[in-house]
């Protein structure tokens, strides 16, 4: 579908979704954001839903300001995927061992590595920039520096919620590895620290929503936030890269006879800020549950733990600030899903997938999400599909 504009907003709110299908709370969030004087436009993706801090599935383009609560607490959260030389014919009948080996190699939930992962010992891992990245830890906010040991041991770990590690097949029978994670606890603590600072600034008093608090360019607070933000985004990228390297090691060992080969990795953030230029103006673009989809750029749009996901290539639609959805998008809250569904429903909806089917992941049941096929149909002018993949193993935290 092409976009529709939300009427009555102070700046263009272009929506790649049916406005009637969007919760009132999410619509109010969007209207509130549009009132900020630094806003130059909003693009709303088809996976849109109400979110903490800002609407999930929104792209917020601002000149000279950024809203830290809109980025959220999982700075740099995103996806990585890689196609392998393995095919369905290489797979064993029982995939439970593979799932167990993945869970042994990559800590999930609140878990962390007993010792810091040495990237130099990971097959093919590009270590250039690694030492420089960690040297910049000395320059981040003093309030979180005591977390350095935890940050190093959580590097290469999954987390919980909708984060996952999946072993997938595409329609041609090729095996893909895919995972979803972010900046772990260090990103959360940095985000909360800066959100608190923003909400105490004089120019942010009296806002209709305290989550609209912004940092303004050329101020010490903005400089500090952007320094920590970009470091956390890099942490998230490294976190996924190390997880993927550990995942590949498992696959090499489990499929030793097949001698798997891995293609170039695709990686994309979907909770982050980027400096981009539109209509001759330098903007700070916040993608809150959205991926960049510039012309020819690869991206990953996952479904849920029982549905398909998509590898895509961007079409470079500037009306959407070169963006696309980050997934299917929730259609009910986690608590609502737990009240409505049972573990029997979860078993039914994840049939054929080697995964957890207990009450601890009931809030991730596929029916709690919008139909991914509908979401993809609504953004045909934002991305083209490169591959449709479906998980056969799913690891959750």
Regions found by a protein language model. Give the residues of each.
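Domain-length cofactor-binding catalytic modules of enzymes
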Residues: 2-29, 37-41, 50-56, 65-68, ...
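N-terminal cap/recognition module
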Residues: 64-85
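Compact, glycine/acidic-enriched structural inserts
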Residues: 78-117
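Short beta-strand-to-turn element immediately C-terminal to the catalytic PLP-Schiff-base lysine
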Residues: 59-61, 82-83, 312-313
């Amino acid at each position: 579908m092409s976009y529709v504009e939300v009427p009555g907003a102070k700046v263009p709110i272009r929506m790649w979704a049916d406005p009637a299908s969007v919760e009132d709370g999410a619509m109010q969030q969007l209207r509130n954001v549009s009132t900020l004087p630094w806003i130059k436009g909003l693009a709303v993706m088809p996976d849109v839903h109400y979110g903490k801090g800002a609407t999930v599935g929104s792209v917020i383009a601002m000149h000279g300001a950024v809203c830290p609560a809109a980025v959220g607490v999982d700075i740099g959260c995103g996806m990585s995927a890689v196609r392998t030389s393995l095919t369905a014919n290489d797979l064993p009948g029982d995939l439970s061992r593979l799932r167990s080996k993945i869970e042994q190699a990559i800590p999930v939930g609140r878990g962390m590595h007993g010792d810091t992962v040495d990237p130099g010992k990971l097959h093919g891992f590009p270590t250039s920039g690694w030492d420089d990245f960690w040297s910049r830890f000395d320059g981040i906010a003093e309030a979180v520096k005591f977390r350095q040991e935890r940050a190093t041991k959580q590097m290469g770990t999954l987390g919980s919620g909708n984060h996952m590690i999946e072993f997938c097949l595409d329609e041609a029978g090729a095996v893909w590895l895919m995972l979803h994670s972010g900046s772990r606890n260090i990103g959360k603590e940095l985000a909360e620290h800066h959100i608190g600072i923003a909400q105490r600034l004089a120019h942010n008093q009296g806002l209709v929503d305290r989550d609209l608090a912004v940092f303004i360019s050329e101020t010490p607070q903005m400089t500090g936030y952007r320094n920590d933000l970009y470091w956390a985004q890099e942490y998230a990228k490294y976190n996924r890269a190390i997880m993927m390297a550990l995942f590949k090691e498992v696959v090499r060992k489990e499929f030793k006879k097949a001698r798997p080969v891995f293609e170039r990795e695709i990686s994309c953030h979907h909770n982050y800020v980027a400096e981009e230029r539109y209509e001759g103006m330098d903007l700070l673009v916040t993608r809150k549950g959205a991926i960049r989809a510039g012309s020819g750029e690869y991206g990953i749009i996952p479904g849920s733990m029982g549905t398909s996901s998509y590898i895509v290539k961007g079409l470079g639609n500037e009306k959407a600030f070169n963006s696309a959805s980050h997934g299917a998008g929730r259609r009910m809250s986690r608590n609502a899903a737990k009240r409505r569904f049972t573990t029997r429903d979860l078993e039914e909806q994840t049939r054929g997938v080697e995964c957890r089917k207990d009450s601890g992941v009931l809030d991730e049941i596929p029916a709690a999400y919008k139909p991914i096929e509908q979401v993809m149909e609504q953004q045909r002018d934002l991305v083209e599909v490169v591959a449709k993949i479906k998980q056969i193993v799913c690891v959750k935290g």
